[in-house]
């Protein structure tokens, strides 16, 4: 039986909200998309909630209402563009906006007011996907490897899927064993933060600014000494660890570097932590499929190909899947799994004690 779902994803980059319409039968098919750029004031509010501050509970409650109303408007626009009505959609899978991710302390917080979203859209909402996995002893992240497995597993071995959003995570796909996956470290988060602080630009288009600089080995080695990179998976991370303050901490006591050299070094950090993670976890990788915003960073993609000479590095576009929409598709699929009672976490990815059905349901 065919079902229609809507997936909503707002990632750690805080640049915008992705809304995807999915047709789900024996496979997942992307039918339409809608993108909402994050308003500057809401971006600032959400970024502020990622670290300790004053009156956080009230600020979070207000911010999530703004976020939710934006999403509801986007869902309405998407449906109108497709000449569809809410009754045709089985559910919205809403990730919400992560403001804290501390699995070692037993919590991950996503705001988004799914009750209000169900009320505004008149569509059942499935949300709160991470906490059940954490309750079962897992990291609560990454959750997309199970979807990567469903989408890209065609019984070929030695394939990996790399998502480069604010943070980078890998899914390792082999035909004879369960999918494995983990966070590698910063994806775009430090690159975006640095160029925003130095040039007041939202991101480094094509990695051109990074390509204009030189990698500083002293800084690179200091960055690579972080405990996260020395820890074996399952593991996940977030802005609590990797942020602009973390960069400034490591720049302290180093000779003055040009801003573009810092950017080049941050790009090298992203590329190295991805390739080293991949090589240590999967002896042979014939094919690396890249999705997320980082797939458009030409300098980063070029560097990954250089570091992985025996691996074909390409965008998920090769499979006819737009790299910008894989995560939003994943949360539509996770909503489907929840309503069907299908466990969607992978203990080989998160470290949970077992398979669990993920998500909380807010009926229309």
Curated annotation (Swiss-Prot):
ATP binds at residues 11-18. It catalyses: 1,6-anhydro-N-acetyl-beta-muramate + ATP + H2O = N-acetyl-D-muramate 6-phosphate + ADP + H(+). Pathway: Amino-sugar metabolism; 1,6-anhydro-N-acetylmuramate degradation; Cell wall biogenesis; peptidoglycan recycling. Pfam families: AnmK. InterPro entries: Anhydro_N_Ac-Mur_kinase, ATPase_NBD. Its EC number is 2.7.1.170. Transmembrane segments: none annotated. GO terms for molecular function: ATP binding; kinase activity; phosphotransferase activity, alcohol group as acceptor. It is an enzyme of class 2 (transferase). CDD domains: ASKHA_NBD_ANMK. This is Anhydro-N-acetylmuramic acid kinase. It comes from Pseudomonas savastanoi pv. phaseolicola (strain 1448A / Race 6).
């Amino acid at each position: 039986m065919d079902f229609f779902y809507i997936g909503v994803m707002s990632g750690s980059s805080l640049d915008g909200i992705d809304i995807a319409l999915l047709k789900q039968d024996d496979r997942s098919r992307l039918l339409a998309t809608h993108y909402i750029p994050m308003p500057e004031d809401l971006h600032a509010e959400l970024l502020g909630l990622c670290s300790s501050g004053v009156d956080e509970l009230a600020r979070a409650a207000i911010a999530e209402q703004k976020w939710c109303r934006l999403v509801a408007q986007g869902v309405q626009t998407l449906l109108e563009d497709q000449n569809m009505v809410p009754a045709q959609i089985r559910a919205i899978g809403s990730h919400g906006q992560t403001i804290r991710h501390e699995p070692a302390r037993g919590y991950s917080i996503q705001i988004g007011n799914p009750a209000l979203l169900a009320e505004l859209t008149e569509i059942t909402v499935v949300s709160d996907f991470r906490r059940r996995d954490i309750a079962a002893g897992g990291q609560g992240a990454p959750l997309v490897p199970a979807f990567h497995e469903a989408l890209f597993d065609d019984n070929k071995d030695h394939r990996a899927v790399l998502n480069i959003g604010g943070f980078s995570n890998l899914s390792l796909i082999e035909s004879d064993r369960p999918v494995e996956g983990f966070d590698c470290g910063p994806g775009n988060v430090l690159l975006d933060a640095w160029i925003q602080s130095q040039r007041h630009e939202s991101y480094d288009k094509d990695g051109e600014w990074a390509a204009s600089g030189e990698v500083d080995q002293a800084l690179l080695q200091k960055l690579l000494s972080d405990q996260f990179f020395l820890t074996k998976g399952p593991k996940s991370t977030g802005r609590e660890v990797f942020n602009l303050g973390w960069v400034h901490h490591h720049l302290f006591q180093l000779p003055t570097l040009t801003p573009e050299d810092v950017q080049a070094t941050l790009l090298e950090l992203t590329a190295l932590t991805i390739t080293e993670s991949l090589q240590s976890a999967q002896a042979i990788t014939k094919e690396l499929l890249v999705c997320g915003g980082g797939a458009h960073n030409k300098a980063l993609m070029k560097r990954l190909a250089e570091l992985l000479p025996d691996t074909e590095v390409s965008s998920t576009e090769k499979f006819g899947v737009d790299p910008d929409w894989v995560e939003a598709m994943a949360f539509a699929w996770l909503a489907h799994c929840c309503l069907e009672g299908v466990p969607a976490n992978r203990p080989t990815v998160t470290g949970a004690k077992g398979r669990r059905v993920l998500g909380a349901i807010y009926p229309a």
